[in-house]
Amino acid sequence: MSNLNHNLVQYLKEFVVDERRELFEEKIQQRTKHITIVLENIFQGRNISASIRSADCFGVQDVHVIENDNIFNDDSEVSMGADKWVSTTIYNQEENNTAKAIKKLKDDGYQVIAATPHNADCDLYDIEISEQKIALIF
């Protein structure tokens, strides 16, 4: 945390009761970057907003949104404030957004796993997630 952010946090702590501050600190410690969610080319923004809300609910800190044909617009009535607590990275260059996102995730040490409706693929329950960080693409 930068000095400016640290000083701001210290200043703002004066205005929060200890019980609330302890709750925030507890919840922050329960967040995970071991699992991240990747949403590729989702047609309806409310589906992304609902996914962000679910990520927040499960303690997932990072959500990656890949825009190829569809542009993400947060639906605040669906995300219900979760977008303020979950870090969102949007890949929206002119081309190769999926490839760029996958490369970044792999460079960051994630095993990339794509959800697929095919029967011949492996079952999600067979994937070992305790050792390596995983990025689930939907």
Regions found by a protein language model. Give the residues of each.
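Post-transcriptional modification and biogenesis factors for structured RNAs
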Residues: 1-138
